[in-house]
């Protein structure tokens, strides 16, 4: 499954004081706002964005299981970023059932890539292998 995407961009600089909301040296709020807008334009319902210690989360409405995209700069860089889709496994468990995640995750991955490619604001888009993502 395509769940981890890295790229380079100067379009998403840190907000002043952003490192007070998440870990120092990490940022991505502008990127999260950009993605939220892009996903809305692609027909997804965005529930909101939120700060986490590792970066920013863009929550996507999905009735079957929690669905979100994490995004952050690579630690100590100003223009290198990674986005990742959760869940990143082909199935999630809910009570006693096993729910397939692949179709909706792939739809979101396709939209994520399209938002970036159509914007012209990023370069070096690269999907990471499962081994690289776990790295």
Predicted features along the sequence, with ranges:
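A residue-level signal for beta-strand positions that form part of recognition/binding surfaces
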Residues: 4, 66, 80-82
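Ser/Thr-rich, low-complexity intrinsically disordered terminal regions
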Residues: 49-66
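Broad, structure-driven detector of short, well-ordered beta-strand segments within folded domains
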Residues: 65-75
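Short beta-strand elements
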Residues: 46-50, 124-126
